[in-house]
Amino acid sequence: MQIIISPAKKMKEDIDSFACRDLPALLPRTRVLLRHLRGLDVPSLRKLLSCNDQIAELNYARFQTMDLERDLTPALLAYEGIQYRYMAPAVFTSDALEYVQEHLRILSGFYGVLRPFDGVRPYRLEMQAKLKTDFCASMYDFWGEDLARLLDGEGVLLNLASAEYSRSVLPHLPPGIRVITPIFGERNGAERVVEKGVYVKMARGEMVRFLAEQGTDKPDALTEFDRLGRSEEHTA
């Protein structure tokens, strides 16, 4: 079973806690993006990233000086969003770390697909960024089928990614792949389930931690997940 999750906007550098094991598998494609991003001025970058001046200036400086092979942070520790705080990888046991290295994949607009111990640099580039160039019509067009090709989950994919990121993978999966997309929410009446954004992010991180602690790759184990209250799952 392979697990996919989204990245987070906020990132940090941590080159001391754990050593990186590898470079991202799609780094040549990342270099193409980096060359383009280095050619943008701050106003153009602000528009592309849909951010304020401060974030645009920060990422302009990042892209201008970025070395994709030095001063790297393991991807699993580089992201600081709610999902990652509830996953709490910094306190994983060695067995749990090996589990996520084998089963967990982080989707990224800049790097494509990341294993937990792939080395990364802080960046801002979301999958929904309106990147239109002479080599692509969008981020989804740029990555195409590349992300799906790198997922090898023995026929089962646990989708813990947002719609923005799962869209880069699900349409390109080969026939026969079972996709499990959990729904984390509360019933509002007899039929409707309401998902709350913050709660969903918390639950996704907790589910990764639960599976890593259990060390299981069996989809049936998901029925035992009971952290943060009830969870339901939908299988496509």
Question: What kind of feature is each model-predicted range?
Answer:
Residues 121-129:
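Short, conserved phosphate-binding/catalytic loop or strand-edge motifs used
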Residues 16-83:
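Glycine/small-residue-rich interface belts in oligomeric ring/scaffold proteins
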